[in-house]
């Protein structure tokens, strides 16, 4: 007969096998990056102590008392030689919270810290918080900018009506957080990201103005705004620096992912684009670059997507979605792109600064018409014929 302790032992062995599983790159990629065979984090990776009561008297059937649904949309930072993710963990009750998971190499063996982050509340408590972007700012703090969701009390009869604001917190150890007032804006805001450097002596934010909680409405794309005081941040003026366009991957909406990476050629940006299709909304990742001298000036934008859901990545709570709000650039130029698939699990893809800059600078842009797309393909065919005939 299997005893309670036998079940616990087997459960821990199964969990450890999952946590210690080695990850390997998938062969035959696109040359831009390498995806990896296994997700790096799933709901099953969360600590057993978060889910099980290990007291046989109060839990004789060894049931999960608190179930986890997903691990997704994680901020990322290199910290004390470790690769850290501030993960959005979603419970079975639909409430999201933040928790730190760390890895020695950035691609596998991610393990959560003992407890979730205790995030101080705003003056007006939020129902849900999620999708943190981490920025190690030159002012010495690590900032977390995330979405704070509350019910829209202006529509008391609609239980799905919600508001979205950009919440701001800062820390120096990723354990103790100081909550600052939410970013004051003229419209709802999601996907807000703090630029890592001062610009003209001010804090700079990438924004995404929108009319509704889901729909962007008149919001034109990824915006840019300067703020005098981060402790009472208010956006009075913003301008669109990366716009939406008809019949593109960012037709319906787009948003900045993590903060951009500084290179000697310009700022590398990772963003998500959304278009409508017969099955709903399709989320993909794309890139663009901005000038070092003027971070609002786009200097390169390759046409189409960089990364899309493939194979099992397509299946999950919200189908046909990839989303990224964290990446890490190592000192040797290697880049770790952390992305979630279908609002369910976390993955990693690796590349280099040089490859991503080459991709941005030398991939044809979208000229918004089929004719121009065909002309580019024919020009490449002609070039290859000439090259291969030598």
Where are these regions (language model features)?
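Beta-rich carbohydrate-recognition and catalytic domains
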Residues: 1-73, 77-127, 136-193, 197-252, ...
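Short glycine-rich, acidic/polar surface loops and turns
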Residues: 310-314, 322-327
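Well-ordered alpha/beta subsegment
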Residues: 328-333
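Short, surface-exposed ligand- or partner-binding patches at beta-edge/loop junctions that are enriched
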Residues: 336
């Amino acid at each position: 007969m299997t005893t309670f302790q036998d079940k616990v032992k087997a459960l821990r062995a199964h969990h450890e096998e999952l946590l210690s599983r080695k990850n390997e790159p998938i062969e035959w990629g696109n040359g831009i990056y390498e995806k990896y065979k296994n997700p790096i984090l799933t709901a099953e990776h969360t600590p057993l102590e978060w889910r099980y009561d290990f007291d046989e008297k109060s839990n004789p059937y060894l049931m999960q008392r608190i179930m986890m649904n997903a691990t997704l949309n994680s901020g990322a930072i290199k910290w004390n030689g470790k690769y850290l993710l501030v993960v959005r963990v979603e419970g079975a009750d639909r409430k999201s919270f933040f928790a730190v998971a760390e890895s020695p190499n950035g691609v596998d063996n991610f393990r959560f810290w003992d407890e979730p982050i205790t995030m101080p509340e705003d003056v007006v408590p939020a129902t849900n918080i999620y999708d943190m972007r981490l920025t190690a700012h030159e002012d010495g703090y690590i900032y977390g900018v995330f979405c704070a969701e509350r019910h829209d009390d202006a529509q008391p009869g609609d239980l799905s009506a919600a508001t979205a604001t950009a919440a701001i917190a800062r820390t120096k150890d990723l354990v103790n957080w100081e909550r600052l007032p939410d970013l004051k804006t003229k419209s709802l805001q999601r996907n807000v990201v703090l630029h890592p450097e001062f610009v003209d002596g001010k804090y700079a934010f990438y924004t995404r103005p929108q009319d509704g909680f889901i729909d962007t409405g008149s919001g034109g794309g990824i915006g840019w705004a300067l703020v005098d005081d981060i402790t009472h941040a208010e956006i009075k003026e913003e301008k669109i620096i990366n716009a939406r366009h008809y019949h593109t991957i960012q037709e319906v909406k787009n948003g900045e992912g993590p903060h951009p990476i500084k290179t000697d050629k310009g700022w590398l940006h990772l963003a998500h684009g959304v278009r409508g299709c017969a099955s709903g909304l399709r989320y993909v990742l794309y890139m663009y670059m901005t000038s070092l001298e003027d971070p609002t000036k786009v200097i390169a934008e390759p046409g189409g997507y960089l990364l899309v859901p493939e194979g099992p990545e397509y299946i999950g709570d919200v189908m046909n979605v990839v989303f990224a709000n964290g990446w890490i650039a190592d000192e040797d130029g290697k880049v770790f792109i952390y992305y979630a698939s279908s609002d369910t699990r976390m993955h990693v893809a690796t590349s280099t600064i040089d490859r991503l800059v080459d991709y941005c600078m030398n991939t044809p842009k979208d000229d918004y018409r089929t004719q121009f797309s065909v002309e580019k393909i024919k020009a490449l065919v002609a070039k290859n014929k000439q090259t291969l005939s030598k």
